[in-house]
């Protein structure tokens, strides 16, 4: 700024305003991206404002020009300033217009041209940084770190570097912990110092670790763990310390060294590792337990020999290797030996003892029972007669084995085929020596004990299929009749729970021989079998027995009984009313519809035929062998009949047939029929089962369907009202 307090003319005042030393900057154009120098921008702001005021004055005077300005004062100084100002005007941008109609804009901010990069260079490291690209040679450089002597620290500093590091120096014997062995004269053995050093790059020769394994050679030692590199055996010869003793104690008995020489080590002797013995200070582990049994069998007693302990065996081996070292073997007293022999002979007990720890480790093995001799079944008398007294002495220790399909495989289910041979499995016979009863077992030695049903309970038990009730007497059973006779039906001893053929219980025909009923089977079995024609005649006779009685005295029976007497085309009355066993094959007829609509009288009927067939596994009895066979399958869970559509299994064939009709969509039972005058009745609904149609007749809609049929039956029965299945009388 100008320091002249007196104002001058316009021309001189303009240059006085620029009386300042020019800054050492270079004016860049507006499109440059250099940083601003804020200090110099603030310094020139006042001069620019003064220049703007003079420029306005010059615009008002059109005769003035920049070339007409005259300078006053020091001509040399003003001339120098004028040249600098002219040079400044030449470098001004084009937006500075000194015309009347131009608007003044300030010049761009001055910038400083940088010659050096102010940011540090990260491309190249400094020379004092050591970098090695070899991954295997990565180490800690300790050249510039303070060094410590081995007297101050146990771990030498040379262990922290590798031979490739710059600060590496050769290892010396003073950098390591030395193990000095004192000989008998008391002098140190300095010749073996190099061999006794703890080498950090390899496992120590006295370490508890192996070179190829992370597991310790003493896996169950209480003083070592799997990650320990400190050896308890770092003594020459190595000493196995006893339990609860100081680790590394040198005041141990030399007899505990197990006969190892000074150049041998516990890890290098594979014989001790394979013996499986429990060392002193160790416990039972998975590494030594499998071989303990082998050593106990090899060295232990059982045949009158003395049982060697694990320590005694190791001492004997050590004494065999070192002749100069005599180890005493622990001897037991005579009483202890006798007791151990008795226990060994009785319980096969193997004892592992440690005399220093005063404890015994016993393992008791219970052997399986000795298998007795097998006597063939069916040849008892022949063997007893031929062998004489030899077999008589062994009769009490032998078992009779019956090889059947039911007992050869314990997982096999009971079936009706092997149930017929069940009496042979429990057959008993008289002994030769003491007349005692011997139980005959199967090959597995397992007896299936099933309590037989008493006769009294079986007689009072109602049948599941044949409507047997308390009216059935014990005398109706063929078992009592057979027992009263000679008892020759059962060839195996007279057990009455076997399936008896139908021909033995009832005569198959009027021409059948009655002598065969109690004789003993002299005739062929084919003659005693029931023929299919005769069986069908028996069924028809049972169905017509009631109809024949109604024909003799029709007035003594109810109208419902007379309607049932005219039923000659039905297949099975019991199947429809009680269990529906044969209802699928029944034709739709007038009598069938009446039976379904009228209430059943099964509770009022008495059993006409005896329950001849009893179940072996429960108290139930049946009048037909088919019903018994189907019932036994409920015990054995046997379902041999399989549906061809869905694979569902059934115990009875007619159940499978009825189920297959559901897949086919066949419904044989319809709610429809014709009256005697030809009028149709019913709603026409179809049902797959007869019991479903009977339930339909019990509904309100079903009562209306069957009402006309019941009215017609009432008219035919001399005007007496009929009671429907719901208990309502038809009037």
UniProtKB/Swiss-Prot annotation:
Residues 54-87, 178-225, 364-398, 465-587 are annotated as: Disordered. GO terms for biological process: bipolar cellular bud site selection; calcium-mediated signaling; cellular response to acidic pH; cellular response to calcium ion; cellular response to mechanical stimulus; cellular response to starvation; cellular stress response to acid chemical; filamentous growth. Pfam families: zf-C2H2. The keyword DNA-binding applies. A zinc finger (C2H2-type) spans 613-635, 641-663, 669-700. Keywords: Cytoplasm, DNA-binding, Metal-binding, Nucleus, Phosphoprotein, Repeat, Transcription, Transcription regulation, Zinc, Zinc-finger. Induction: Expression is higher in white cells than opaque cells. Induced during exposure to the weak acid stress of acetic acid, through the regulation by the transcription factor MNL1. Transcription factor involved in the regulation of calcium ion homeostasis and required for the maintenance of membrane integrity. Binds to the calcineurin-dependent response element. Plays a role in azole tolerance. This is Transcriptional regulator CRZ1. It comes from Candida albicans (strain SC5314 / ATCC MYA-2876) (Yeast).
């Amino acid at each position: 700024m100008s320091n002249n307090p007196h104002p001058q003319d316009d021309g001189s005042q303009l240059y006085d305003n620029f009386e300042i030393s020019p800054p050492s900057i270079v004016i860049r154009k507006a499109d440059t991206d250099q940083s601003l120098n804020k200090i110099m921008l603030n310094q020139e702001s006042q001069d620019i404002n003064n220049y703007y005021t003079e420029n306005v004055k010059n615009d008002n005077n059109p005769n003035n020009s920049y070339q007409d300005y005259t300078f006053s004062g020091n001509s040399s100084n003003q001339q120098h300033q004028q040249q600098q100002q002219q040079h400044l005007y030449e470098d001004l941008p084009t937006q500075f217009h000194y015309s009347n109609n131009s608007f003044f804009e300030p010049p761009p901010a001055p910038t400083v041209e940088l010659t050096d990069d102010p940011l540090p260079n990260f491309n190249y490291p400094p020379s004092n940084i050591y970098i090695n690209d070899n991954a295997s040679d990565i180490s800690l450089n300790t050249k510039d770190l303070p060094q410590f002597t081995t007297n101050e620290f146990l771990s030498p500093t040379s262990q922290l570097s590798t031979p490739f590091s710059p600060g590496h120096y050769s290892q010396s014997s003073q950098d390591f912990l030395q193990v000095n062995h004192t000989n008998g004269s008391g002098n140190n053995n300095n010749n073996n110092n190099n061999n006794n050093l703890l080498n950090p790059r390899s496992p120590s020769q006295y370490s508890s670790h192996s070179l190829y394994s992370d597991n310790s050679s003493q896996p169950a030692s209480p003083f070592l763990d799997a990650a320990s590199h400190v050896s308890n055996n770092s003594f020459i010869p190595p000493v196995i310390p006893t339990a609860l003793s100081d680790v590394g104690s040198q005041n141990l008995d030399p007899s505990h060294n197990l006969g190892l020489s000074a150049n041998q080590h516990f890890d290098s002797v594979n014989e001790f590792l394979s013996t499986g013995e429990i060392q002193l200070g160790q416990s039972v582990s998975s590494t030594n337990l499998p071989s303990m049994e082998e050593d106990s069998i090899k060295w232990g007693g059982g045949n009158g020999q003395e049982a060697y302990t694990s320590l005694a065996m190791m001492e004997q081996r050590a004494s065999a290797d070192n002749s100069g070292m005599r180890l005493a073997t622990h001897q037991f007293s005579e009483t202890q030996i006798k007791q151990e022999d008795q226990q060994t002979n009785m319980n096969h007990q193997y004892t592992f003892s440690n005399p220093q720890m005063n404890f015994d480790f016993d393992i008791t093995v219970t052997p399986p029972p000795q298998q007795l001799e097998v006597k063939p079944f069916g040849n008892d008398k022949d063997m007893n007669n031929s062998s004489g007294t030899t077999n008589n002495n062994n009769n009490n220790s032998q078992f009779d084995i019956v090889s059947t399909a039911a007992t050869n495989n314990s997982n096999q289910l009971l079936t009706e085929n092997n149930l017929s041979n069940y009496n042979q499995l429990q057959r008993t016979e008289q002994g030769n020596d003491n007349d005692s009863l011997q139980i005959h077992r199967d090959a597995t030695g397992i007896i299936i004990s099933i309590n037989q049903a008493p006769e009294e309970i079986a007689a009072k038990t109602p049948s599941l299929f044949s409507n047997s009730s308390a009216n059935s007497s014990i005398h109706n059973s063929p078992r009592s009749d057979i027992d009263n006779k000679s008892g020759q039906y059962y060839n195996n001893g007279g057990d009455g729970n076997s399936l008896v053929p139908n021909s033995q219980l009832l005569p198959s025909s009027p021409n059948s021989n009655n002598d065969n009923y109690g004789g003993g089977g002299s005739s062929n079995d084919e003659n005693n079998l029931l023929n299919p024609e005769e069986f069908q005649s028996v069924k028809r006779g049972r169905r017509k027995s009631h109809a024949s009685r109604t024909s003799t005295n029709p007035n003594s029976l109810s109208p419902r009984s007379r309607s049932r007497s005219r039923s000659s085309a039905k297949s099975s009355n019991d199947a429809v009313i009680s269990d529906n066993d044969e209802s699928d094959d029944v034709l739709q007829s007038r009598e069938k519809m009446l039976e379904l609509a009228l209430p059943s009288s099964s509770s009022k009927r008495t059993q006409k035929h005896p329950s001849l067939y009893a179940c072996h596994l429960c108290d139930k009895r049946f009048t037909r062998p088919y019903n018994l066979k189907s019932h036994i399958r409920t015990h054995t869970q046997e379902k041999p009949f399989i549906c061809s559509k869905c694979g569902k299994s059934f115990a009875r064939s007619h159940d499978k047939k009825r189920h297959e009709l559901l897949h086919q969509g066949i419904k044989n039972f319809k709610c429809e029929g014709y009256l005697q005058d030809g009028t149709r009745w019913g709603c026409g609904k179809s049902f797959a089962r007869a019991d479903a149609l009977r339930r339909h007749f019990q509904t309100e809609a079903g009562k209306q369907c069957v009402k006309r049929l019941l009215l017609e039956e009432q008219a035919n029965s001399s005007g007496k009202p009929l009671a429907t299945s719901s208990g309502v009388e038809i009037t």
